[in-house]
């Protein structure tokens, strides 16, 4: 068993490169990763093989774990650790969270035996046409409840894990297997969530008296592989969209609704002894790191929007207004200037400076003039008193002269 692994310092360095390229997104597309990968000077055909190996989930993009795988392969090729790109991904390079995908891909090469296809001659009495691929929200919620109760750790469903559900339905075993084959074109031992929902949807309609469809639409079949499924009725093909109403009563209308009996007695499901092996990146890059990247990106976007808004505002302010409308910007400017002037006058009045100081000086001068006037009046009164005293003295002198 190989002792090779991606070291901690490598993962941290790869994270710095990944974060600088991803712009806050969890994945890199081909064009984003090309600038770094092509710096290795490897041939394009080598880089294509590296990309195919690293893209474990086959979605055409590299998340951080897959990016680490690609970078390590590139460095090993550049440093001579590898002479050629390996045909399969070494076990020590398989991300722990995606090891089930690698094992499933390898297992597909064995092509397990598929259930025998049962040809439907459409001669079953009481069955109706009008199957619809559109899932009503209530039905979809019930399908997801069944799926969540029975999925394994890889998020997949095995045929036999739903046997109690089959037993509770009024659906022949041959029709159950036909529905399974329809959503499992690769004849895998398990199917993913989207295929499971479609499988349960087919069983629901068969339980309600509708014939099982012969084929799956090409877009829907592709969605089983891409893990994406379109549940919007507006996107359905006309032949599927305008079928009979799923709520139409059928000869089996008095039966319990699809899955109700099964769900009512369902215990804990989805148990599995599966233990993934491979490189574990979960202890290195935490959610906080992603949050920092997202916040930096949001900050840059806000700064860009702010600059754009400021430029637009300046452009509107500088643009002449010839349409005869009121320039509210000019009105606001004049009002602010008037307010500033009044505030300055009030401040000068309180501090005794400026024009208010001149007014205070005039008032003080008036008070001084008034005080001088009062002093003049006092002096005049004092002079009159002295004159009376002088006159009295002169009279006394005259009387004294006469008496001699």
Curated annotation (Swiss-Prot):
Lineage: superkingdom: Eukaryota
Residues noted as binding Ca(2+) in the record, renumbered to the chain: 55, 57, 59, 61, 66
Membrane topology: Peripheral membrane protein
Gene Ontology terms for molecular function: actin binding; calcium ion binding
Family annotation (CDD domains): EH
SUPFAM superfamilies associated with the record: EF-hand (SSF47473)
Positions in coiled-coil regions: 280-401
Basic and acidic residues: bias regions: 314-324
GO biological process, one term: endocytosis
Pfam families according to UniProt: EH, End3
Swiss-Prot/TrEMBL keywords: Actin-binding, Calcium, Cell membrane, Coiled coil, Cytoplasm, Cytoskeleton, Endocytosis, Endosome, Membrane, Metal-binding, Repeat
GO CC terms in record: actin cortical patch; endosome membrane; plasma membrane
Region (Disordered): 304-328
InterPro entries xref list: EF-hand-dom_pair (IPR011992), EF_Hand_1_Ca_BS (IPR018247), EF_hand_dom (IPR002048), EH_dom (IPR000261), End3 (IPR025604)
The EH domain, residue ranges: 10-100, 139-227
Positions of the EF-hand domain: 42-77
Subcellular location(s) per record: Cell membrane; Endosome membrane; Cytoplasm, Cytoskeleton, Actin patch
Principal cellular location given in the protein's record: membrane
Biological function: Component of the PAN1 actin cytoskeleton-regulatory complex required for the internalization of endosomes during actin-coupled endocytosis. The complex links the site of endocytosis to the cell membrane-associated actin cytoskeleton. Mediates uptake of external molecules and vacuolar degradation of plasma membrane proteins. Plays a role in the proper organization of the cell membrane-associated actin cytoskeleton and promotes its destabilization.
Record family assignment: Belongs to the END3 family.
Complex and partners: Component of the PAN1 actin cytoskeleton-regulatory complex.
Protein name: Actin cytoskeleton-regulatory complex protein end3
Organism of origin: Aspergillus oryzae (strain ATCC 42149 / RIB 40) (Yellow koji mold)
Classification of source organism: Eukaryota, Fungi, Dikarya, Ascomycota, Pezizomycotina
């Amino acid at each position: 068993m190989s002792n090779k692994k991606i070291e901690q310092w490598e993962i941290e360095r790869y994270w710095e490169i990944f974060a600088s390229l991803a712009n806050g997104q969890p994945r890199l597309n081909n064009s984003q990763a090309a600038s770094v990968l092509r710096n290795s000077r490897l041939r394009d055909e080598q880089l294509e093989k590296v990309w195919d190996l690293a893209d474990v989930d086959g979605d055409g993009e590299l998340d951080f774990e897959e990016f680490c795988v690609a970078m390590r392969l590139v460095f090993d090729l550049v440093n001579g650790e590898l002479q050629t790109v390996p045909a399969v991904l070494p076990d020590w390079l398989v991300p722990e969270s995606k090891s089930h995908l690698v094992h499933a891909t390898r297992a597909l090469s064995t092509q397990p035996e598929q259930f025998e296809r049962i040809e439907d001659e459409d001669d079953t009495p009481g069955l109706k046409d009008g199957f619809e691929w559109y899932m009503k929200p209530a039905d979809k919620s019930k399908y997801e409840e069944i799926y969540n109760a029975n999925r394994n750790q890889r998020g997949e469903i095995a045929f036999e894990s739903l046997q109690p559900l089959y037993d509770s339905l009024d659906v022949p075993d041959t029709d159950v297997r036909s529905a399974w084959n329809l959503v499992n074109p690769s004849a895998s031992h398990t199917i993913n969530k989207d295929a499971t929902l479609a499988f349960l949807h087919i069983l629901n309609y068969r339980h309600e008296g509708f014939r099982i469809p012969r084929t799956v639409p090409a877009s829907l079949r592709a969605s089983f592989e891409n893990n994406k499924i379109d549940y919007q009725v507006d996107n359905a093909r006309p032949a599927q969209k305008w079928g009979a109403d799923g709520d139409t009563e059928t000869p089996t209308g008095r039966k319990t609704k699809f899955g109700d009996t099964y769900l009512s007695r369902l215990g804990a499901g989805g148990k599995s002894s599966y233990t993934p092996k491979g490189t574990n990146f979960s202890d290195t890059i935490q959610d906080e790191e992603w949050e920092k990247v997202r916040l930096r990106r949001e900050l840059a976007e806000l700064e860009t929007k702010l600059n754009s808004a400021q430029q637009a505002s300046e452009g509107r302010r500088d643009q002449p207004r010839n349409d005869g409308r009121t320039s509210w910007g000019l009105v606001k400017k004049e009002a602010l200037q008037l307010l500033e002037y009044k505030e300055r006058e009030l401040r000068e009045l309180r501090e005794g400076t400026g024009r208010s100081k001149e007014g205070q000086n005039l008032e003080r001068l008036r008070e001084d003039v008034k005080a001088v006037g009062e002093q003049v009046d006092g002096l005049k009164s004092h002079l009159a008193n002295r004159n009376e005293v002088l006159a009295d003295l002169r009279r006394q002198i005259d009387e004294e002269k006469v008496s001699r």
